[in-house]
Amino acid sequence: MPTLTQQKIRIRLKAYDHRLLDTSCDKIVDTARRTDAVPVGPIPLPTRRRIYCVLRSPHIDKDSREHFETRTHRRIIDIYSPSSKTIDALMKLDLPAGVDIEVKL
């Protein structure tokens, strides 16, 4: 079990498509395990829903509206006791363009 004094890498992932996000998480966890690091996660965070209300008509009829929604799915992966091999392997990892990645050391 990880202790408080160990070094860790925290990776935050965001995407609109949850399937793309889960495959990216699996790639990161597999890469960390291959380099003898200890991955914890992926931990799902709450999904952010943004709802936009738009009038359907360009002029009148304010009663007629349309709603659009974007959902942002988020995950966190913690990697404990990383080595230089772990960091190199994570940097070389090819992830899809639809996934936003934040890395904190």
From Swiss-Prot:
InterPro entries, A to Z: Ribosomal_uS10 (IPR001848), Ribosomal_uS10_CS (IPR018268), Ribosomal_uS10_dom (IPR027486), Ribosomal_uS10_dom_sf (IPR036838)
Pfam families xref list: Ribosomal_S10 (PF00338)
GO molecular function per UniProt: structural constituent of ribosome; tRNA binding
UniProt keyword list: Ribonucleoprotein, Ribosomal protein
GO biological process: translation
SMART domains cross-referenced by the UniProt entry: Ribosomal_S10 (SM01403)
Transmembrane segments: none
Cellular component, GO, one term: ribonucleoprotein complex
Function summary: Involved in the binding of tRNA to the ribosomes.
Stated family: Belongs to the universal ribosomal protein uS10 family.
Subunit structure: Part of the 30S ribosomal subunit.
Name of the protein described by the UniProt record: Small ribosomal subunit protein uS10
Source species of the chain: Synechococcus sp. (strain JA-2-3B'a(2-13))
Classification of source organism: Bacteria, Bacillati, Cyanobacteriota, Cyanophyceae, Synechococcales
